[in-house]
A protein has these predicted regions:
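Terminal accessory/targeting
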Residues: 1-50, 61, 65-75, 186, ...
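Active-site beta->alpha N-cap acidic-glycine motif
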Residues: 26-111, 117, 121, 128, ...
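A cross-domain feature marking catalytic cores of carbohydrate-active enzymes
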Residues: 51, 78-80, 102-104, 142-144, ...
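Charged helix-capping and loop-helix junction motifs
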Residues: 91, 118-122, 177-184, 214-220
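A short acidic, helix-capping loop that chelates divalent metal ions and anchors anionic groups
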Residues: 108-113, 207-211
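Basic- and aromatic-lined ligand-binding clefts that recognize polyanionic substrates
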Residues: 132-146, 151, 155
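His/Asp/Glu-enriched short active-site or ligand-binding loop at hydrolase and phosphoryl-transfer sites
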Residues: 146, 152-193, 233-242
Length: 242
């Protein structure tokens, strides 16, 4: 009986460890277990502001104004369905010289989807981009950061580099601009100590639909740009890193 019980416990422990490893590989933004993904460059004085889930109406337009005021370029990972609904704003983002990346067509958790659905989401988004802004994306960020080998493989087959991040603003939570800016400042400081650049995850939209309020994110962006620039930080788009 002890042997049977012991074997069951060992099997359960192994299953738990395997599940934990899979979760880490699929969900931790800096994990490379499922294959190489672009995180950041090696210069600790470089940072990339990246904005997910747009375009989002006046919020995105105001963000473009803030970036222009600070002479900064950013990377926008846009949802295809939002681009379809607001093509004029997506064109404004591109015309302002910002880098546009693919964030899927409808923002599902791709790690749980079939291979056919993954390809449909990525290729559909790029088809919208080609129609609206005249070019497919060269970079892809998985919604929620959730990926598995098939997600990364499909992105590469479609000519895109998978991109994750190493600074999380946590701006999807109902927190203040000061809290968001503090999260970013701490992330940048950690990366500088480790001798690497900072890839900052922010949001100008929301995958639940258009009109998501993001004013704290915009205010935090202005704060971070002013403070980091004063400290000698340079802001780049993710294509500077690969």
């Amino acid at each position: 009986m002890q042997t049977v019980v012991g074997g069951a416990i060992t099997a359960a422990a192994a299953a738990g460890a395997g599940a934990g490893l899979w979760w880490y590989a699929a969900m931790w933004p800096q994990s490379q277990i499922f294959g190489p993904q672009l995180i950041a460059g090696r210069d600790p004085m470089e940072a990339a502001l990246t904005f997910d889930d747009g375009p989002n109406g006046d919020t995105t337009l105001r963000l473009l104004d803030i970036l222009a005021e600070h002479d900064a370029q950013a990377t926008f990972f846009l949802i295809g369905d939002c681009v379809r609904q607001q093509p004029q704003i997506a064109r404004r983002v591109a015309e302002a010289g910002h880098l546009i990346g693919n964030h899927s067509m409808t923002h599902p958790v791709l790690a749980w989807q079939s291979a056919a659905r993954i390809r449909e989401e990525l290729s559909g988004c790029n088809a919208i981009f080609e129609d609206v802004i005249g070019a497919k994306a060269r970079y892809f960020r998985p919604p929620h950061g959730a990926r598995r080998p098939a997600v990364l493989r499909t992105a590469r087959e479609l000519g895109m580099t998978p991109v994750l991040w190493n600074v999380t603003a946590f701006d999807w939570n109902p927190i203040s601009a000061e809290e968001i800016a503090g999260n970013i400042d701490r992330g940048i400081a950690t990366n500088r100590r480790k001798g690497r650049g900072s890839n900052i995850l922010l949001h100008d939209g929301g995958h639940m639909g258009l009109g998501q309020p993001r004013m704290p994110s915009l205010s935090a962006t202005a704060q971070v740009l002013a403070k980091a620039r004063a400290g000698g930080m340079r802001f780049v788009t993710v294509d500077a890193w690969g």
